[in-house]
C-alpha cells in the first residue's frame, strides 16, 4: 500500500499518516510513550498533550502538572491549548516553545464539554468565525512554530458552507493544518461521522487536512485515507486499545518494525491482539509509576494514579472481550502494588486465558 503526505504537516517533518488524538485524561506522558513504542523505525508523527488551559499555563510548574509532564526522549510534541485571549496565549506559547520544547501549537476549537464552553473555548469559537481567526492570528504573532486547529463539522448544507468559510479564515490567519472531526457539537460522539465533509474540506482548503472519527482499525484508517484523500488520520480511543495500529500501518507502508520488535510481524488476529493488549496494559501501568512518581510530587497521590489507570481501562477496555471484568477487578484495587497484581493475574495468572480483542465496539458513550 502507498500513501504520500503531499501537503506538509509540521512543515514537512511528518512522514507517517497516523497520529494520536489529544484526549483529556488520556494523552499524558505515560500513555503517550507506551503507544510510541509501536511507532515503526523511521516514522515521524506528531504527539499531543491533553488540553491545556492558556490561563493556567503561564504560572504552572511544568515538572509538576500532570497534563504537561513529558519524557526527555519525546520528540515532535504538539501541545493543544484552549484559549481566546491574547495575553494568556502569548505567555503560554512562549513558554511552550522556549521552555517545554514544543514542535507546534494546536488550538482546540472542537471540544464540546460544558467547562470549555463556559469560558468560550473549544467548539464555542466556531460560533464566531472572525474571532476564531483572530485567535489564530494572536497565536501566530507570538510563536514561530506551525499552528494547527482541531474543529468539528457544520450541520447540513448551510453548515458545510459555514465550515468551509470558517476553515479558510483560519488558514488565512496562519493555520498550517486542520483536523476535522465530522460530527457537530450537538452530536458529540453519537451518530456516524460524516467523512464526506473531510473529503470536501480537503478539496477546498489548501493546507494539510487530518481526518478524525469512526476509526477503530487499520482498515478503517486506510479507508478514510482512500475515500477522503486526507493527508493523515487522527485516532482517539481506538489507539489507546490498539496502539499497534501504528505498526500495522507502518508494515503496510514498508517501514521497519518498531525498536525492540525487529524480525516480528504486527499482531493481526484477535488472539494476537489480545495478547499484545495484555503487554501494553501492563506497560502503561508501569509507566504511570515511572513518569508520575508519587514520592517526588507533593500533590500527586497513589489514589490519583490508580484513578488514571482505571480511566485508561474504561476507555481501552471495551475492545477486550472481558474488559468489563478487568475494569471491575481494577476498581477494587487499594494500592498501586495491588493494582499491578490484579492486572498481571488477570492476563497471566494461573486461571488466565487469552483475551481476544474485538474489531470494533460502541464508542457513543
Labelled PLM ranges:
Residues 1-10, 14, 18-19, 134, ...:
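Alpha/beta catalytic cores of nucleotide-metabolism and tRNA/nucleoside-modifying enzymes
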Residues 2-8, 23-102:
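Glycine-rich, positively charged N-terminal anion/phosphate-binding segment
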Residues 18-22, 47-50, 77-81, 105, ...:
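Hydrophobic faces of well-ordered beta-strands that scaffold small-molecule active sites
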Residues 23-25, 52-54, 82-84, 110-112, ...:
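Active-site beta-loop-alpha junctions enriched in small/polar residues
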Residues 29, 87, 114, 126, ...:
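Short, electropositive, low-hydrophobicity segments enriched in small/polar residues
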Residues 34-39, 90-121, 129-207, 223:
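Alpha/beta enzyme core
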Residues 60-64, 128-129, 242, 335:
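Short, solvent-exposed helix-helix connector turns and helix-capping sites enriched
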Residues 64-66, 120-126:
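Short glycine-enriched, charge-decorated loop/helix-capping segments at active-site entrances
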